Amino acid sequence: MQVKSHKPSKQRKYLYNAPIHHRGKIMSAPLSEELKSKYGINSIPIRKGDRVKVMRGDYRGTEGEVISVDRKRYRIAVKGIVRRKADGTEVPVPIHPSKVVITKLYLKDEARKRLLERKGVKVEEIVEESE
């Protein structure tokens, strides 16, 4: 059994030093109300290919597909949310996964299907509905 600390400094230290297989779990995002009722789960680790809606910050209300997940910096990039650099090139704006809501799950991933099955969802029905 691992003892957890309540100290904010130790919580930050854990985030900075967390191994990559823990970082994926930490980078979970809540599901939309529709998906919550459909799958019976509140949140799931975010992955490339999911459709998300930004709920906080300057880009609130923007919806798009996740184009990259940066586990080192705990940020995601969403298609359509870009910032123009001084030389004119566009770069994706990093967004924290807790500030978005997943509106559509990417279900072509076998690991994601196994995860949903573990949580009690019948994946065959899901795949048929999404196609």
Swiss-Prot record:
NCBIfam families per the UniProt record, alphabetical: rplX_A_E
SUPFAM superfamilies: Translation proteins SH3-like domain
Coiled-coil boundaries: none
A GO cellular-component term linked to this record: cytosolic large ribosomal subunit
Chain's role: One of two assembly initiator proteins, it binds directly to the 5'-end of the 23S rRNA, where it nucleates assembly of the 50S subunit. Located at the polypeptide exit tunnel on the outside of the subunit.
Gene Ontology BP term (one): ribosomal large subunit biogenesis
Assembly behavior: Part of the 50S ribosomal subunit.
Keywords linked to the UniProt accession: Ribonucleoprotein, Ribosomal protein, RNA-binding, rRNA-binding
Family statement: Belongs to the universal ribosomal protein uL24 family.
Transmembrane segments: none
GO MF term set: RNA binding; rRNA binding; structural constituent of ribosome
Protein name: Large ribosomal subunit protein uL24
Source organism: Korarchaeum cryptofilum (strain OPF8)
Pfam entry (one): Ribosomal_L26
